[in-house]
Regions:
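Histidine- and/or cysteine-centered catalytic micro-motif in compact active-site loops
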Residues: 83-85, 101-105
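Contiguous surface segments at macromolecular interaction interfaces
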Residues: 1-41, 51, 94, 105-172
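A generic structural signal for short beta-strands and their flanking turns/coil linkers
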Residues: 76, 96-98, 142
């Protein structure tokens, strides 16, 4: 272990690292984390995931409007939480699927222009350019670049997080 997140990839050293839960809507989760497709999605896997750079890369880019995500720092560990798809109770359908590590976080103020922002997002973003343009107008814009380190074989449901990990039900 060298301490360089890219050189050590996929190894993560959790000691002395901050850890967070990052919730992602199902429609974005599957495209972004192609190795974390749920069993109930497998029959549609070919339709859900195309052979594109953002699906195949270890680098992932996600847009958030949750103000506290701007406080993320390089090396922070993100537990990816796929939110409920509306097909049943969140207790069973919202799950932790993956572990990532923050590479870089940028807010709207870090970009000198719309073009600068679009160029930054171009390589690893799952989002359409029209959406990126629209979202750039939002002052709460946070762009999170992360490495996709682990797709969990056993998924943790919201119920498990509430009952066993004692995570607050009001957190998300």
């Amino acid at each position: 272990y060298t301490g360089d997140m890219l050189f050590d990839y996929p190894l993560i050293q959790p000691k002395n690292k901050r850890k967070f839960l990052l919730s992602i809507y199902p429609k974005f989760h599957t495209q972004l984390f192609s190795d974390s497709i749920l069993k109930n999605e497998v029959r549609n896997a070919e339709d859900l995931v195309k052979d594109v750079s953002f699906s195949n890369s270890i680098h992932k880019l996600y847009i958030s409007f949750m103000p506290k995500t701007a406080n993320l720092k390089r090396g922070d560990i993100l537990t990816i939480y796929r939110t409920n798809d509306g097909m049943g109770a969140a207790r069973f359908r919202s799950v932790v699927t993956s572990i990532c590590q923050v590479e870089e976080v940028k807010t709207k103020n870090d970009f000198i222009s719309l073009d600068d922002y679009l160029n930054y997002c171009n390589s690893y973003s799952i989002f359409q350019k029209d959406d990126l343009r629209k979202w750039y107008r939002n002052d709460n814009l946070v762009v999170i670049k992360m490495t996709y380190n682990i797709a969990l074989a056993k998924r943790l449901t919201r119920g498990m997080l509430l009952d066993e990990a004692k995570i607050s039900p009001t957190i998300y």
